[in-house]
Amino acid sequence: MKKLLLPIILLNFSSIAFAQEPKMLPIGFAPGEELLMDSYLKSRVSRAPITTPPTLPVRTAAQWEESQALLITWTGFPSIHRQIIAAAQLECKVIIHCADSNVVKSDLVANGVPLTNLKYIEVPFNSIWIRDYAANTCYLNDVDSLILVDWIYNRPRPDDDDIPLAYSSFLNVPLYQTEVAPNNLMNTGGNWMIDGMGTAFASELILEENDGAGAYSIAYPNHTSTVIDQIVEDFHGINRYIKMDVLPYDDIHHIDMHMKFLDERTILVGKFPTGVSDGPQMEANLLWVLSNYTDPWGNPYKIVRVPMPPSTSGAYAPSASYRTYSNFVIVNKTVIMPVYRQEYDTTAVRIIKESMPGYKVVTIDADNSGANLISQGGVIHCITHSVGVTDPLRIVHNYLNDTYNSTTPYQIDAIVQHKSGIANASVYWTTDTTMPYTAASMTLTGATTDTWTGYIPAQPVGTQIFYYIKGQANSGKQQVRPMPAPAGWWKFKILGTVSIEENLANVFSTSVFPNPSHGLTCIPVNSNRKLSGKLYITDVTGKVVQVVHTGDFKQGGSNYFINTSEWTSGVYTIVAETNEGVTAQKLLVK
């Protein structure tokens, strides 16, 4: 695959991994490694059987889809690996790449970890960072055939580069590689965030490492952004590749160190104290994304913020290791996340649990003496990868928002797919999660799009409805979404009907946030019908400091964004002036 004809110095370096427990390599370049990249890349010879794009439509799976296996490489941090294995083996197989399986088994037994649901591949390796060098789960025709897609790894570590060939062969899954021109592409799993519907996020590292020079003064690969987009569309089915500016203090420029898709509509994003570390660039990137992109259904992305914790001394990058809570892995119904210190961990765990109801959240301390994984530049997501199931039953749903409708049923549409076809689907709903759910049958309403439709009966004003969707394939396989259902669910609330005066008041039915503000700030605007007007902000003298929006306010909810990082501290007024009147809300800028 990737290591033939290598220089002698590189071969000697890589062979350490199999001969003995390897010296720990960081997630970034180790001293001297960058100098090896030129000769390493020039000498690469692919051993993968498939280096051309799939001929059938391809879709890259999201992390919340069903996994058959979690992947790790056993080296360097056995105490952390034990905890990952103990949590993941309850959800799926754990495939352990290792030098000696007997050593691994003895360690697990000695520390009380069952040897159940585990598979071992004895294979040479260079490092622990399997997220970056493993292949990605994709499906042909949405759900029909499982394949794996691998890229050129951006480190001169040939044994790591061969890991995808080892486990794809072990699982008997076809392996595609972007190894051969004109489809040669360098990429890394930490800089790859997928929604399962054709959208990918990345930092502009993807451009830097494929511009013909990169950091290595080499002429390979050499692609424009347009060509890169075409390669990921051909191999991954990605039709929207969103590339953000790199963060100045995240040395590896992997976005999994500060953000993560929680579902198709929701993005978890780290939050630094105002003006600190990568905070300003992170806020600017987020504002740019929200101003230019929507979720697959045209809704503004729902953003969940989680604090970026400091070091024990209170320092942030570049004066300390880059600690983050977003670097977790979703393994079917379990979230395995890094933690650091209780004073920050409690808030982060609460945010994850509230944002992903029903998921079991397992925490692993990555900042302990003797197990200080974060000091190496990555955490849990960085040292794990996954392989999807061979027969996914896929359910995709644009979940309902709060509504003023209390008289007509609530339509539930979902894409439900399986390679054997779908026998039936139902929506289950309740107004009290301590009580049983009621099933409502769904019918196939879009044969070409695999869309199924059902209805929840109308409910009185003030009711909160919890619901999930279940599908059954012709093969008999069943699946629910959200996957932890009925413990997990979507929810929406029935709001009251309003008069003109009340409708005007409801323009700001949700408060601006964060408030106080210093940086990216969201102004939610809501209306139960279309209104015309403008949204602007005044200072204490009444002077207009920014016009945010002029024109129509659509029915329902819209989010508008401002950046107050350069504003003078004080009290400002956000004004919504419509054809039905004026309403206002105070904003404090720190």
Mark where each language-model region is.
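Glycan-association/targeting regions that enable binding to alpha-glucans and other polysaccharides
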Residues: 387-498
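Generic detection of short hydrophobic beta-strand segments and adjacent strand-loop junctions
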Residues: 72, 304-306, 440-442, 492, ...
